[in-house]
């Protein structure tokens, strides 16, 4: 627990630095957007890909399969719980349900998993990320607009993160090990993930209207559902499963990440 709190404390300090950098004019809105794009399209895929540069074992492959299956289960739990507690009564019910179900598991989840569990954590997280994209661009789109086009769905699924998963998985199953210089290069790029993500998060936070957010009581309720109720429901179900605790914790962490936007 102390290690977790220490890692989270470090991340919050870097986030605070991002706020300061924006307030002092070192970051602006355009730079923040470019850094965010660089993070999502270059750094995150590098972290994901290099997480597969580990020695192949049947046990790891089976565990990865469990990670995919548990991720599907986690989303089904989230959808069910959200349908029960949020309902369709609010004018913004679709947005609220989308907010509770879909976390920012790439932006925040990868740095957390990488900081706490290293490559193993990111390795297991890739299962959740893949399932996230599948659900988000099908169920999520249908939830918001009532339908999902096949071409648009396929295009959206071909994100850099998913490409990183596919290439990494091919190398892992095919026992393809890159030269150490390339792995070190990917590792070096990936090491930017946590500090860059937190700096961007801080700069984004500095642009937000916090006063209006803090005075909207509905936001507190939805946040409680997203950050407490839903992760607790998933953790309760997972507590009965005799599986790798690191894998289970990584998926719970992904579920408990803040709201995603796309």
Regions found by a protein language model. Give the residues of each.
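Alpha-helical transmembrane segments of multi-pass small-molecule/ion transporters
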Residues: 1-262
